[in-house]
């Protein structure tokens, strides 16, 4: 079989080959297979992606159809998916074989195989035990991927030679996006590597005219169509344009003409189509029994996909980007590249430009460049002719452009090799380099070997969450989350394990997005976080980045939980993927344990049982911020945690209250001045007071932003309930608890302080009047006017200052002196705030 891919050497002018010369060409593919397979097999049970439970269900249906001989029921996907179904069914069958042989029993299986298959596939879309099968269905996918990587290596070796083939294959094998998708059971990975094998074999046929390459190309084109018919159709234009690049630019061998290559291209396109069509028919059993129905079924599915967006489409964080943008994949592609492939692709494009300029100048290209230039151009059009058409399809997903990553990897390898060759040539021209380097020991392979090993090491550090790798040259995942959808289930396994530790053998109900991906790893009951009730009544709630980005299940739920303090956060690669929150928000039993018990009834409808705060003593700058009202229609950025002191109000409902009611929480000093305030609807409007019934206990969490200029001292809380439409108050709970603020660890910047009336008037060199918060007011006899004056000390003060207040008539004359107050010298605090 190796003879298909290898050029037989001629030994007429050579001595008898050594053992290493005979063994090495066979040993390298074996090593590549092992190296490619190991990271794809390790920890296959680590997490389950959002579609894999469905794929296990489809594989079980396919296995049942195959065992019963009912080929009409083998149509289980909206596309053929035959290679994936066969591999998945093989894994499912082997898992059941391990059970019935006694090697690895499944406790829930009590009947024979056919009965079990009928029971597990009874409810479409729900597979109850994915974790029992996930390794068994993923392993065949990983095995096939490793074999195809070896095939790609052998084809590139015929195309480019051993060193460049080895370098480019390592880039392909350890591309994180390719690596991630060749570890899971789905149709996109087989489509991608079948297309690329077909493409490489097609180019080899154009060059050499050997039938074996045309047969390989057609066979793998058929396999690509059997994986996903729609995208595989792009292979025809890709082959035509790639072949045309070889017809026009490839250096002719002795006796060759351009017309000869042109005829070969036309014959190859027709032959490849016929072979691919025959393979499509022969390898898909459903085509044998009902071919017209199958073809019509595929066409209708393609039309449906093009008309409808993905059910989870949405607007990303920031509101300026959506996956319905026609430029979406132009953001997806660079974010999923590595630094090495990014640089390599840019160098390859530079190679095209440089070669074009030289050709326009009638200059002769170097032999290596002239031979590789058609392939570089063909790979560029591979990307363009795939991404362009698929960008017009309504349903979007980053994995839908997986095939182009094989092309970009080889393109990057060619660009890097071209640059390394040029760089070595420049270095060898230096006189000092001649003492240490020679052409023999200065090769591109040696120069680039360390670079590719460094990249492989960096990628393997993400194991097994390769989906979480994003191009660090573009800011990595921290930046990617604002431009493309992130999260396919990775990290939910970690969240489930964290909750298993928290509950410690007494698991409680958890509401989670992607519940089918969370529940296999959680020991308790899981409900889907698809509506408000799941979030309100569950003891724990798990939010996922994919959900938060797209605004599910509702903007109101996301806004409320964004203001809460999570119990735990799951991070992958420095990016927050899952947030675990405590609950329940609504219950029937009070906890009877509060940091600050209150017991005040407001409005005759709500009993404020108590208040909990995150901390009772902390630095004055620990929870600084400004209260903001969100007017954005886009989902809140969960990783950008809302500022402020976490505070929980515990209410017990007495009766429903008509109208729209807000709660405010204030932080006050001993003189009654406000240093922090938050004001919003109870539960951010999730459960309005007009729905209240007696006996409910509400756990309502807030974040109280504290003024950056707040001085150290003793403070207390105040909670009020009022109608924000009419302004009617329903009571205030005053003097709640005691909170101690210690000196700030870092002094605030003057621009961060909320000063309603900013003056910035210099009193003298060390002291500046920043401003005040007094407003115009009409005073009645005996009334008071309270406010704050803000000072800035530019250097330590060496004396005390006295502040004088007076009333001033319209013409400017002083009417009456109100008060003289001495201010204490403060040498350490940058801000001195006088209150009156």
Show where each model-derived region lies.
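C-terminal luminal/periplasmic domains and tails of membrane-associated envelope-modifying transferases
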Residues: 2-11, 16-19, 476-836
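Membrane-interface helix-loop-helix junctions at transmembrane boundaries of multi-pass membrane enzymes
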Residues: 19-23, 158, 250-270, 348-380
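Signature aromatic-anchored transmembrane alpha helix within multi-pass, membrane-resident enzymes
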Residues: 30-33, 239, 273-274, 353, ...
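Short helix- or helix-capping micro-motifs
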Residues: 32-36, 168-173, 180, 200, ...
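Interfacial juxtamembrane loops and adjacent helix segments
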Residues: 55-58, 64-140, 292-321, 482
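Transmembrane-helix motifs of polytopic, lipid-linked glycan transferases
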Residues: 139-160, 197, 201, 357
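Membrane-interface transmembrane helices that cradle and orient dolichyl/undecaprenyl
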Residues: 157-159, 163, 198-214, 224, ...
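Membrane-lumen/periplasm interface segments of specific transmembrane helices
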Residues: 267-304, 451-468
């Amino acid at each position: 079989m190796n003879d298909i891919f290898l050029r037989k050497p001629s030994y007429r002018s050579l001595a008898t080959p050594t053992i290493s010369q005979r063994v090495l060409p066979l040993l390298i593919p074996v090593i590549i297979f092992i190296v490619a397979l190991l990271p794809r097999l390790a920890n296959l049970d680590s997490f389950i992606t959002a579609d894999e439970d469905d794929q296990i269900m489809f594989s079980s249906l396919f296995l049942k159809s195959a065992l019963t001989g009912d080929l009409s029921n083998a149509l289980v996907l909206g596309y053929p998916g035959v290679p994936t179904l066969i591999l998945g069914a093989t894994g499912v069958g082997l898992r059941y074989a391990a059970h019935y042989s006694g090697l690895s029993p499944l406790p829930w299986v009590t009947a024979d195989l056919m009965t079990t298959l009928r029971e597990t596939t009874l409810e479409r879309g729900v597979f109850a035990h994915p974790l029992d099968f996930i390794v068994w269905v993923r392993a065949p996918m990983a095995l096939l991927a490793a074999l195809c990587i070896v095939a790609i290596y052998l084809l590139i070796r015929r195309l480019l030679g051993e060193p460049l083939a080895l370098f480019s294959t390592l880039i392909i094998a350890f591309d994180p996006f390719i690596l991630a998708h060749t570890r899971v059971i789905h149709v996109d990975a087989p489509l991608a590597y079948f297309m690329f094998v077909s493409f490489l074999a097609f180019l080899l046929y154009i060059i050499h005219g050997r039938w074996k390459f045309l047969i390989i190309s057609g066979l793998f084109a058929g396999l690509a169509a059997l994986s996903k018919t729609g995208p595989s159709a792009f292979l025809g234009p890709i082959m035509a344009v790639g072949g045309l690049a070889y017809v026009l630019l490839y250096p002719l061998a002795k006796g060759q003409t351009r017309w000869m290559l042109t005829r070969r291209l036309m014959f190859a396109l027709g032959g490849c189509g016929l072979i691919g069509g025959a393979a499509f028919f022969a390898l898909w059993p459903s085509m044998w029994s009902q071919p017209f129905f199958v073809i019509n079924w595929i066409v209708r599915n393609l039309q449906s996909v093009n008309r409808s967006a993905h059910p989870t489409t949405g607007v990303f964080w920031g509101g300026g980007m959506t996956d319905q943008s026609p430029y979406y994949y132009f953001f997806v592609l660079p974010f999923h590249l590595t630094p090495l492939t990014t640089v390599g692709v840019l160098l390859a494009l530079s190679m095209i430009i440089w070669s074009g300029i030289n050709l326009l100048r009638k200059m002769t290209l170097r032999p290596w460049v002239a031979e590789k230039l058609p392939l570089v151009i063909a790979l560029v059009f591979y990307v363009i002719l795939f991404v362009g058409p698929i960008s017009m399809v309504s349903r979007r997903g980053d994995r839908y452009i997986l095939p182009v990553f094989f092309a970009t990897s080889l393109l990057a390898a060619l660009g890097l090799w071209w640059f390394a060759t040029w760089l070595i040539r420049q270095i060898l021209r230096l006189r000092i380099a001649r003492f240490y380097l020679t052409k023999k020991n200065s090769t591109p392979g040696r120069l680039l070997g360390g670079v590719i090993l460094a990249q492989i090491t960096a990628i393997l550090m993400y194991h097994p969450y390769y989906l979480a790798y994003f191009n660090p040259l573009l800011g990595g995942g921290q930046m990617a989350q604002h431009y493309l959808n992130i999260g396919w289930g990775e990290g939910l396994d970690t969240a489930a394990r964290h909750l298993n530790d928290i509950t410690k053998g007494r698991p409680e109900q958890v509401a989670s997005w992607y519940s089918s991906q969370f529940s296999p790893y959680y020991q308790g009951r899981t409900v889907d976080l698809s509506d408000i009730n799941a979030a309100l009544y569950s003891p724990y709630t798990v939010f996922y980045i994919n959900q938060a980005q797209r605004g599910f299940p509702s903007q109101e739920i996301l806004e409320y939980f964004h203001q809460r303090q999570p119990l735990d956060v799951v991070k992958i690669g420095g990016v927050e993927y899952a947030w675990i929150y405590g609950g329940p928000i609504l219950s029937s039993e009070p906890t009877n344990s509060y940091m600050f018990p209150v017991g005040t009834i407001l409005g005759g409808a709500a009993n404020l049982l108590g208040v909990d705060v995150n901390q009772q003593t902390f630095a004055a700058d620990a929870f600084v911020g400004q209260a903001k009202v969100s007017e954005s229609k886009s989902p809140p950025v969960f990783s950008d945690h809302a500022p402020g002191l976490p505070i929980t109000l515990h209410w017990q409902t007495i009766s429903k209250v008509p109208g729209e009611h807000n709660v405010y929480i204030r932080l006050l000093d001993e003189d009654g001045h406000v240093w922090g305030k938050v004001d919003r609807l109870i539960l951010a409007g999730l459960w309005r007071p007009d729905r209240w019934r007696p006996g409910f206990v509400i756990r309502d969490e807030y974040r109280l932003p504290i003024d950056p200029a707040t001085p150290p001292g003793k403070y207390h809380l105040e909670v009020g309930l009022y109608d924000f439409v009419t302004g009617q108050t329903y009571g205030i709970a005053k003097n709640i608890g005691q909170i101690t603020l210690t000196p700030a660890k870092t002094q605030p910047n003057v621009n961060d302080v909320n000063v309603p009336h900013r003056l910035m008037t210099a009193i003298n060199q060390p002291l500046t009047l920043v401003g005040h918060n007094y407003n115009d007011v009409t005073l009645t006899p005996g009334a008071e006017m309270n406010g704050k004056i803000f000072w800035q000390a530019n250097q330590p003060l060496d004396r005390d200052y006295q502040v004088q207040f007076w009333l001033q008539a319209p013409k400017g004359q002083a009417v009456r002196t109100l008060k003289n107050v001495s201010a204490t010298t403060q040498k350490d605090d940058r801000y001195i705030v006088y209150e009156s």
